[in-house]
Amino acid sequence: MRSRSSSLEDTGKAGLSSPRGGTRRDQANHSSRRPQEATPTIHRNHRQREHKPKPKSRDLTRDDLLFLLSMLEGELQARDEVITVLKAEKIDLALLEAKYGFVTPTAVLKSLQRDGLQQSSGWQEDIYEKPIAELDRLVEKQRETHRRMLEQLLLVERAHKHTLHRLEDEKKNHRDFMKKSDDFTSLLEHDRERLKQLIDQEKTYQERKEEESNKQVTNLKDELTKLKSFALLVVDEQQRLTEQLSQQITKVQELQNSAGQAQEELNSAQTRLQDEENKVLRLEEELRKQTCHFHQEQDAMTAKLTNEDAQNRQLRQKLSSLSRQLDELEEINKTLHRAEEELQELRDKISRGECGNSSLVSEVEELRKRVLEMEGKDEELIKMEDMCRELNRKLEKEAKQSCSLKAEVDKLNHRIMELEKLEDAFRKSKQECNSLKSNLEKERTMTKHMSNELDVLRVRIKELETTEVHLEKTELTLKEDLTKLKTLTVMLVDERKAMAEKLKMMEDKVQNSTGKLQAEQDKVNTVTEKLIEESKKTLRSKAELEEKMCVATRERDELKAKLKTEEEKSSDLQSKVSMMKKRLQSLETVERELLRNKSKEEHTKSPGPYRYQQEDNKVKDLTQEVERLRRKLKEMKVVEGDLLKTEDEFESLEKRYSNEQERAKALMEELETSRKELSKYQLAEKEESNQEQILYKRLKEEEAKSSHLTREVEALKEKIHEYMGTEESICRLKTDHTTLQRKLTQQEVRNKELAREMETLTRELERYRRFSKSLRPGMNGRRFSDLHVSTKEVQTDPTDSLSPNYKNLAPLERALVNGKLYVESDPEDEANYNEIHLTKCSPSLMNSVNNLNNNMRRVRGPFLKPRENHHAVNNKRQNGNHVQQGDVVLTHSPGQPVHIKVTPDHGHNTATLEITSPTSENAPSYTSTAVIPTTGAPPKQRITILQNSISPSGKPKGSPPPPESPCTPDRSLSPLTMTAYSQTLTSESCGPLTPDRALSPIQIVSVTTGSPDRSEPAELLGGQTVLRVSPERQNSWQIQRSNSTGPNVITTDDNKIHIHLGSPYIQAVTPSAKPIGPYYSLGPEPRVPVLNNGTPAKGNNKITSSIVIKPTSGPISRPSQITVSNLCD
């Protein structure tokens, strides 16, 4: 395992090549981590030098030398850049805040500081001007608070005197009150005698009243008999009238029913009439239309018939003329036939010659002429025949037409018959309509008559209703009269009963009043006795209070004197503090000048980051001083707040006292008013002692006054209770005085703490001087503080040659537990004075403790008072190492080996650390997981070791432990947070030691007890290991604080385990490391491959480092030995 200085040199000179031996060794360390033997570092380095082959002498040309020079210049420039970067990273935030005034963009401020370092510009401002100004303000504020305290004490003294005067006044008032109470008892006795006389008078009055009431009862009985007879007559009349009313109501109802039925019939008849009228009107319109149509058709037909008749007549006339002509022609034809026959006969005769003569020939000739004429007439006859034929044809046509006309006429006759039938029906309907109209008129007349009758009935009903109303009114009046009579009778009976009851009640009241008077007399006697006893008690309490107030005044004077002495002490301490500050400032100036001169001389030799470690140490001390001053400021503010609270409480007490005085005044006024009322009552009694009504009034007034007296007695009791409340308020004042005294004692304790802080400051000054002396170079270039440590190997034996600066760190370690300052105070004031947190941080001890406090639980570690009990052994040095109270010391039985296995898993970039004790069966085993860095940067690791298979603790994390037994099993139930400090001091085998190696930051190994099931985020400080130990296993292990000059140390009894993980100068980037991957459990001494810059070699993936602690026998008081194996598989 490499030491811290070598790892720091690796981080500062990674990737640089120089002809120096240190850089070559660093390159060799980066390229391959060789297994180192368990021998001291100096011997190993000498062995390496012996085995190094000497480089062959080679003549180089000028060009080669120039090339080498250019390469070296480039490497030097790169080294300077790395140095500036590391300086900027390691610069304290407090310095940045002091220079730039703000801290928030840290990266920007660091880059500005880095540029300033490259330009070699130093600090221009003084950082500690503001704290000095704040100290001056604090001194002025303390003076003001002192003045205010004195003013408040004067006000309290005045108030005390005022309360004493008030108590004397109260005594006088109480005496007066006792005298008045005696007068009041005498008045009550007189009232008792007067009430007895009143009771006798009341008895005589009641006897007279009984006689008068008996007379009134007899008179009322006679009146009752008369009223009963009158009431019977009234009831008979009422029954008769009700019967008449019922008969009239039935008649009215019958008439109303008949009228309703007639109205319904009328309504139905009216509906029927309306329907029939509508039908008749419709039929009349149809008949009118049909008659008009028939008349028109009849006129047309008659016109046609007349025309046809005329034509028929003409034709008949023609026929008759033609028939006549035919007859004439037939007769002529007959005559002609006869003439022809005669002619033929004649011809025959002529031919025959029978007869011949001239006359006949003339006759024949005449006959021939006639025949010719007749032939001419035959043509006419033919024409006439033709004409007759045409006429026959026309006649046939006319006959046909006449037949058709006859048919039409028949049809018309049928229709006329139908129309006549319709006319008959119409006539009948008209007759029916006329009859219906007549019926309607009759019904209308009937309805008018009925409506008139209805109106008459309504008028009669109204009259009946009015009569009903009058009857009801008369009935109501009669009922009212009856009820009045009944009520009168009942009232008379009730009055008689009431009079009897009143007589009994008056007797009972007289008896009750006598009993009440006796009870009130007893109460008054008891109240007077109680008042006398309470007055005696108040006098005693007042005397006791006066004594207590005298004692309180004495105590107050003593407290004032103590305050003055404490203030003088605080002023002396402040003056000493100012002197120490001035001395510190002068020393700082001297140290700055020395450091500037040394930095100019060693700028070419030593690397850059170590220059600023001296400034870091100075900043450490100054930040501690600033934090102490801030704590003092906070304490003064708390004292001011307490004083303000006491002022408010005193004002509230004054208000209460004034309220109680006002109440007492009000009670006295009420007593005076009651006395005035009693005097008025006595005067009124003397004036109106003979009147009866006044006796009733007096009885009521006496009852009211008795209640008033009871109220006054209650008010007196309340006043006594209020006096008791004043006593309680005085007790509270006493408690306030005790709290003030307690606070004064706390102030004294704080002054003692200031004195102790002064001692610590003086020790720090001495340590600072020793540091400055140790920083001066020695004879061979080394520093005096580094001469006793020269190995890179893990130291297993205890060393008593501790550096003087860490011997002086014990008070600091007592004052700082887990990054917080704890003040021991009384348990009552723990809420006000519990913890004061540190605010500023630096890369020094305060910075590391504060960063550790962010991830650890709070623990209140008492450190001011030394514990003189059976646990004081834990404060002694064990093996030269100081064990602090508040740290858990884990003991382990000697003679048993402890195996520590480290099994990395490069698939997940984690490593598992396992601590076991294989021999004991019930020994606890612890496992942990850390992240392995894969880049070339230096490792940043924090290992959280958890105990395997333990039950979680019962208490919560934040519960504070008892302060009496910090290292005993009594504290196993509460989780604890423990810190151990150790300084990392490294040596270099070749080359002069740099001044920064003795001033490396303090490494912290923390052991936290608590429930392991909650995995808290782990923040890495450089080279920090966190062990979690369950509360059940605290009795078997012991972790001691190591103040040796080696790296981080966890000790088991007399054995030491020094575990170094990474560079202390580089802060953590990854805040948490979660256990990922399986745990590999290998043998006790497995071989592991070599790591190149934090990455595994190309062999097997499993790398295991184990530390086995085995007991050895020898004359040295070191019973265990550490075997470190780091071998390849």
UniProtKB/Swiss-Prot annotation:
Residues 43-55 have a biased composition (Basic residues). One of its GO terms (biological process) is protein localization to actin cytoskeleton. Disulfide bonds: none annotated. Residues 909-932, 1114-1129 have a biased composition (Polar residues). The gene is filip1l. It comes from the Eukaryota. Transmembrane segments: none annotated. GO terms for cellular component: actin cytoskeleton. Keywords: Coiled coil. Residues 1-59, 563-582, 894-975, 1110-1129 are annotated as: Disordered. Belongs to the FILIP1 family. InterPro entries: Cortactin-Actin_Reg, Cortactin-binding_p2_N. It comes from Danio rerio (Zebrafish). The keyword Coiled coil applies. Pfam families: CortBP2. The keyword rRNA processing does not apply. This is Filamin A-interacting protein 1-like. The lineage of its organism: Eukaryota, Metazoa, Chordata, Craniata, Vertebrata. Residues 188-776 form a coiled coil.
